Amino acid sequence: MSTAGRPHFGAFGSQPVCYHLPMTTTPADHSASGAERPASERKEPTFLFTEKYVADKSELARRFLDTRERLNANVDKANNFLVKRVYNIDHNAYLEGSLPAKTKELMGLVASACLRCDDCIFYHAIQAYRLGVTRAEQEESLNVALIVGGTIVVPHLRRVYELLEELYG
């Protein structure tokens, strides 16, 4: 009986073995494969606008940023190691690297819209604005979210379009 086209299973027969993935990688593997840049090569993005500027420009953004700051203070008081780790991973994921921070924020915007997280949508729309992403780029990204996420994304689009109107006019 031929096994062509079927995954090969390991010694216990329960987990497929993926022979196309290297078991270990070296820095040379990363550069050759185009994988993520090492941490030493990633850097903080350059924001064109401060959070204060955004808050002064948009009432929706101001309310969101104020609430986020207040709620984050409550989380910080808990001094939870795991939460700090997740926050750190999140921060590092959006640093400049092989992908520009603008692209990463638009990816975050699309994922957040598909997941229907209004706080996340507002956060990424504001960050993208601060990085100099145009309204057209944000709207085109939201079109992708609508296709991927389906019509259930529409109520969230309505809210973020209101924010975009306040930010971009």
Question: What are these regions, as identified by a protein language model?
Answer:
Residues 9-12, 19:
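Aromatic (phenylalanine/tyrosine) cluster motif
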Residues 2-9:
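Extreme N-terminal basic, low-complexity initiation segments
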Residues 101-106, 136-141:
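Alpha-helical scaffolds flanking conserved acidic
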Residues 18-103, 156-169:
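Acidic, glycine/proline-rich low-complexity segments that act as flexible tails and inter-domain linkers
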Residues 124-135:
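Iron-sulfur (Fe-S) cluster-binding segments and ferredoxin-like electron-carrier domains
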Residues 135, 141-154, 158-169:
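C-terminal binding/interaction regions
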Residues 94, 115-116, 133:
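Residues in soluble alpha-helical coiled-coils and helical-bundle/repeat scaffolds
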Residues 107, 111-123:
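Short, thiol/selenol-centered motifs that function as redox-active sites or metal-ligating centers
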